[in-house]
Swiss-Prot record:
Source organism per UniProt: Haemophilus influenzae (strain ATCC 51907 / DSM 11121 / KW20 / Rd)
Membrane-topology annotation of the record: Multi-pass membrane protein
Role, per record: May be responsible for the uptake of short-chain fatty acids.
Alphabetical UniProt keywords: Cell inner membrane, Cell membrane, Membrane, Transmembrane, Transmembrane helix, Transport
Localization per record: Cell inner membrane
Protein name: Putative short-chain fatty acid transporter
Record field: transmembrane: 17-37, 49-69, 98-118, 136-156, 188-208, 252-272, 284-304, 321-341, 359-379, 402-422, 427-447
InterPro entries reported for this sequence: CHP00366, SCFA_transpt_AtoE
GO CC terms in record: plasma membrane
Pfam families assigned: SCFA_trans
Length: 447
């Protein structure tokens, strides 16, 4: 059954799903029209919201571009190539490759979403190189499907924000018993329902992707250039090399800047615990890449080779920033959330919050953005109904991570690394969306 659904969804997506840029543009107009028709915002207001928000994700877009290029450059270092090759050698058949990529990606995304998203795609690429007859598009889809575990992991935006004093919704939860207005991690990340949902995904996702394996003769051929071995970036100097050339290829400079970076990271983690952020992941990738490549210019050549992967991120993120601000400032996000809240009771509230979050995710594919838009409506409603605040908060996170399988926004880094288009993987991802729904329903309603 899973295989049949996968074939249908893949065929459907290949015909009707546009390029992610077209998707972002169409979403802009849909959000504009809905906000105009359903809220008090005028067209002039909405144009201003869109324009004012258009550049709001510049910092975030830079972070995403960096995680792609630094992760890609790190993967092309000789040591990481050897490591990925060793792990990939565990799989001997295309089916084993699919299971291994999904499982490893799921674990990596639980540890840190940025790390898992990039490393998963790089690992899938290595498996495709090693195992002849692999469906490359399915392997890259497996890496993105594994991203479904991130919201309940250690870098999940929602539980971390909810546990942080001064977060955008903290004032709604302040009381004598909770003066800081926080939801502790024991009520979210380390709760029974989150452990059930996250472990169920780790166990079930490899099985689901295994069942998507194409039948004999149905594996799509790909351009061999996509999985061709990456070039080497070291450079041997001649005896008459200039001082400038020697500095450019200097191991001393590479190791010195590496020592500086690792010293900072050591002090940071000593002070803050193992609190990984996207900036820390980027710094780890960058510093480690310089050290492993062995010289500043060898690393720079690897970065130049990787930058072509960032085009989609650089162009599309501003459109999503504009959509997000329209959604937030017009009140459209609140209307959608209130619609689901009004038909809920204490038991069904987290589940309906989950579906409202999934719906909003098309316009706001960001965990932190969901907390800003939905938190002010979800938290008071949960309090009024007597629903579990931790579960209601995590329901927002689950809806976002689940619907990512139908929203190409977060697939852009993986697709950039893989050299594929969104139509190549979204059929598989939407199949995973369908067959993982029961896991979230059981966890939110019955536990």
């Amino acid at each position: 059954m899973i295989s049949r659904v996968s074939r249908f969804m893949t065929t459907f997506v290949s015909k009707y799903l546009p390029d992610p840029l077209i998707f972002a543009v169409l979403l802009t107009f849909v959000t504009f029209i809905c906000a105009w028709g359903l809220t008090d915002s005028t067209p002039v207001d909405l144009v201003n919201m869109w324009g004012n928000g258009f550049w709001n994700l510049l910092g975030f877009g830079m972070q995403m571009a960096l995680i792609v290029v630094t992760g890609n450059a790190l993967a092309t270092s000789p040591q990481i190539r050897k490591f990925l090759s060793t792990i990939a050698s565990i799989a001997k058949t295309p089916a084993q490759g699919v299971v291994l990529v999904t499982f490893m990606g799921s674990i990596a995304c639980i540890i840190n979403w940025g790390f898992g998203l990039v490393v998963g795609a790089m690992f899938a690429k290595e498996v495709a190189r090693r195992i002849k007859g692999s469906d490359y598009a399915l392997l890259i889809a497996c890496a993105y499907i594994a991203f479904m575990t991130w919201g309940g992991g250690f870098s999940g935006s929602m539980p971390l924000l909810a546990a942080t004093p001064g977060n955008p919704v903290a004032h709604l939860m302040m009381s004598e018993s909770n003066p800081q207005g926080i939801i502790p991690a024991v009520s979210t990340l380390f709760s029974g329902y989150n452990i059930f949902i996250t472990l169920s995904l780790v166990i079930c996702l490899p099985f689901i992707t295994y069942m998507m394996m194409p039948k004999n003769g149905e594996t799509k051929s790909i351009d061999p250039k996509l999985i061709a071995p990456d070039p080497t970036f070291d450079k041997k100097l001649d005896k008459d090399a200039t001082l400038a050339e020697k500095m450019e290829e200097s191991r001393f400079l590479a190791y010195t800047i590496g020592a500086l970076g690792y010293s900072y990271l050591g002090m940071y983690f000593y002070k803050n615990g193992f609190n990984l952020t996207i900036n820390n992941v980027n710094l780890i990738f960058l510093i480690t890449g310089i050290v492993l490549h062995g010289s500043p210019m060898a690393y720079m050549r690897a970065i130049i080779n990787a930058t072509r992967s960032t085009a989609g991120i650089l162009v599309q993120f501003p459109f999503y920033a504009g959509v997000q601000l329209m959604m937030e400032h017009s009140g459209l996000g609140g209307l959608i959330t209130e619609f689901f809240i009004n038909v809920a009771n204490k038991d069904s509230f987290p589940l309906l919050t989950f579906f409202s979050s999934a719906f909003i995710n098309f316009a706001v594919p960001s965990g932190g953005g969901h907390w800003v838009i939905q938190g002010p409506f979800v938290i008071p409603a949960a309090q009024a109904l007597g629903a579990d605040l931790g579960k209601s908060t995590m329901a927002i996170a689950y809806g976002e991570q689940w619907m990512n399988m139908a929203q190409p926004f977060w697939a852009l880094p993986a697709l950039g690394i893989a050299g594929l288009g969104v139509r190549d993987i979204m059929g598989f991802c939407m199949t995973a969306l369908i067959f993982t729904a029961p896991i979230f329903i059981i966890g939110l309603y019955f536990l």
